[in-house]
């Protein structure tokens, strides 16, 4: 009952999901053809198929490719390009980790590109302040050279990418940002 409702919903969906229907039916046919008589072996065989569908895309191509003799692999590659977010979850390599103890390491480009105030705010230049200056007006170039604050999400991300060494208070002689390190008139 539930399988027929699911199949009807898949058929009613747009053309993007039609190759998935072909993939599921051909995989089911091949599994039924190669089904073993022992029930414990059958559950192991089908459990392997279920885990491979949930796994990432490269392993999915290799495991289903053994079952389907080439046709399913081409369909899967076609679907993987159309729906990348279903097969590959988004991953951002934000931090570096040391090989010995697994501690987080600082991403050096963050230290070079951004300035962290002691209050936790991050300063950056506007995007594109070095690019294609020949076609930008003088006023626009001046606006792009200005420093702006990073948003809350960006600040949290940058804090993850740096260690506590870069979050300590520094007392530089003649620091132009000395008066901005502490937030005043801030009600918490």
Swiss-Prot record:
Swiss-Prot/TrEMBL keywords: Mitochondrion, Ribonucleoprotein, Ribosomal protein, Transit peptide
Gene Ontology annotations for the cellular component aspect, listed alphabetically: mitochondrial inner membrane; mitochondrial large ribosomal subunit; mitochondrion
Biological processes per GO annotation: mitochondrial translation
Gene Ontology MF term list: structural constituent of ribosome
Compartments (UniProt record): Mitochondrion
Family indicated by similarity: Belongs to the bacterial ribosomal protein bL35 family.
Entry protein name: Large ribosomal subunit protein bL35m
Organism: Mus musculus (Mouse)
